């Protein structure tokens, strides 16, 4: 049985912080894939593992940093060396000093490597120390350190080592979904367009991302709608642009996923 120890968690407005230690036997994990509407910055303190983000696989080890964009499916696929320890920071774009900054950073590269004596390393451990305390200035302090962490990464060259891409057909499927998201209503829409069998498309998704095709498509539509709502689009205009056949079905799907209504998303 996996020995998972959550040693520290902390949440402030617009940001979450966690420090976890795992000590399982090396091998293929049973970790569930997941997706969320915010950025995630993951820093590996110890261990070696293979981590999947959409169509890419990353070999991560001590000192590596991975930046995951909102709406990207990801999970730890295989552990090569234990114990495995990592920091995770989740943050909304509007939480940091410049919401375009994280976007530009993740477009420049997803994987970075930092030295143990780097400013980034000192900052991440200062977050850990801050998470152990309760003050009336938590939000301001966390925001300041988060901004500094992103600036450190901006000044760090991306690390292209240890990155591989998935099956070429899987890449074609993801590209097709991205470009035709609003028009896809069933697996056959994808299979026919790419001259692939329905069963093969379904198999690729299960083996590569551990998720069903239409679950992936539906959640991508919801994420797109969320992004549009945050930019000021009206819920009654968003649903059709994101491929939902009617507003009630969009409302139910969105509310079930986020726990609040599309209208409430515009106000938060």
Feature locations, PLM:
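Short acidic-glycine-tyrosine-enriched beta hairpin
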Residues: 55-70
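Generic protein-terminus/edge-of-domain signal
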Residues: 1-59, 80, 248-249
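A hydrophobic/aromatic-rich effector-binding and dimerization subdomain
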Residues: 1-25, 66-136, 150-157
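…primarily DNA-binding HTH/wHTH and HhH modules…
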Residues: 2-3, 241, 252-268
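Terminal helix-turn-helix DNA-binding modules in bacterial transcription factors
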Residues: 175, 179, 188, 207-246, ...
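Short hydrophobic/aromatic patch on the recognition helix
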Residues: 63, 200-205, 249-254
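Short, Lys/Arg-enriched, Trp-marked, Pro/Gly-tolerant hinge/linker segments that flank
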Residues: 106-118, 131-144, 150-197, 207-219
């Amino acid at each position: 049985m996996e020995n998972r120890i959550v040693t520290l968690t902390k949440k402030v407005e617009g940001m979450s912080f966690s420090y976890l230690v795992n000590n399982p036997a090396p091998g293929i994990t049973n970790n569930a894939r997941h997706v969320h509407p915010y950025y995630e910055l993951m820093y590996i303190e110890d261990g070696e593992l293979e981590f999947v983000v959409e169509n890419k696989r990353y070999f991560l080890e001590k000192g590596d940093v991975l930046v995951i964009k909102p709406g990207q499916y990801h999970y730890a696929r295989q552990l090569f060396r234990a114990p495995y320890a990592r920091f995770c920071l989740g943050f909304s774009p509007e939480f940091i000093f410049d919401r375009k900054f994280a976007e530009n950073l993740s477009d420049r590269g997803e994987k970075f490597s930092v030295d143990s004596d780097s400013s980034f390393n000192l900052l991440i451990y200062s977050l850990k120390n801050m998470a152990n305390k309760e003050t009336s200035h938590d939000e301001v302090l966390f925001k300041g350190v988060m901004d500094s962490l992103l600036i450190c990464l901006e000044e760090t060259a991306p690390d292209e080592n240890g990155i591989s891409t998935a099956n070429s057909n899987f890449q074609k499927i993801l590209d097709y979904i991205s470009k035709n998201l609003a028009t896809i209503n069933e697996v056959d829409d994808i299979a026919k367009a790419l001259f692939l069998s329905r069963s093969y498309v379904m198999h690729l998704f299960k083996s590569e991302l551990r998720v069903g095709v239409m679950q992936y498509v539906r959640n991508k539509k919801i994420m797109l709608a969320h992004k549009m709502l945050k930019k000021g689009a009206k819920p009654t205009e968003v649903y059709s642009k994101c491929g939902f056949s009617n507003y009630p079905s969009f409302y139910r799907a969105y509310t079930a996923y986020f726990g609040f209504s599309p209208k409430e998303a515009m106000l938060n």
